[in-house]
């Protein structure tokens, strides 16, 4: 455990390095730490921090910079998070109110990018087993029925069913009411099992319609499940630490394209409460050793369904990014729960 003096010097070093991007020497530490210490004492403390793996010397004659381990100690122990100001909160609230949940997800990723100047990522709700809030049937032309499925997140999917006979609108309404009353909020796999026994009392043609609707609804919901929306990738080109390492950026952009590894990384966020921070190799992806990821899960009706994240350099203003991610997740949860 670091003593108070070492903690203050490490905190000062990390903050100065994040702010200026240059190795921090003993003179700067003496000036900004508020401690009345000699240069020799500061150098001794820095040597101890280096032995502990918290700081490193990029050049023999230069100052020191934080290591990934140093960033981790800073984030876990020393960081003071700055709350968002009222104007920024209102900006988030105003933007996270579109009618369509898909636009809501896109708006969230764009806001994350705009407010942090890094890449904003939102993973849309994951559905291990498709669930619907309610369905509607609408008669089209001969032997064609429009199935309208509304998910718990408020997303709307449409499918056309080809039927063995024509159905009146009253029959379709009766079938939809039966399904909504008995099965709304249930997993599709559970509904299929229950249909086998519970629909025996209905006419065979009505049973066929309902079974077709459940199958089509399952396909529609799963087909549109768990997309990864990334916004602001190009903003990373403006980050000095990254623009000088195009090979690393190219690998990150490839990761954005593939998205599978990105999903695996963000999956960790679902397993914990609140904001999670992954620094460098903690991301578990070789191509992200120079990056940090700040994530938070969002919910619909209290259930975790997706993730928001910001991806940027390890030298990021964590005290700024963390509240942006946290507030975006909270407001997205509220907006989706209203649908």
UniProtKB/Swiss-Prot annotation:
Function: Negative regulator of class I heat shock genes (grpE-dnaK-dnaJ and groELS operons). Prevents heat-shock induction of these operons.
Transmembrane region(s): none
HAMAP family in the cross-refs: HrcA
Domain of life: Bacteria
One GO MF term: DNA binding
Keyword set includes Transcription regulation: yes
Family classification: Belongs to the HrcA family.
UniProt-listed InterPro entries: GAF-like_dom_sf (IPR029016), HrcA (IPR002571), HrcA_C (IPR021153), WH-like_DNA-bd_sf (IPR036388), WH_DNA-bd_sf (IPR036390), WHTH_HrcA_DNA-bd (IPR005104), WHTH_transcript_rep_HrcA_IDD (IPR023120)
SUPFAM superfamilies: GAF domain-like, Winged helix' DNA-binding domain
Protein name: Heat-inducible transcription repressor HrcA
Organism: Nitrosospira multiformis (strain ATCC 25196 / NCIMB 11849 / C 71)
Keyword entries, A-Z: Repressor, Stress response, Transcription, Transcription regulation
Pfam families named among the record's database cross-references: HrcA, HrcA_DNA-bdg
Single GO BP term: negative regulation of DNA-templated transcription
Keyword Iron-sulfur among record annotations: no
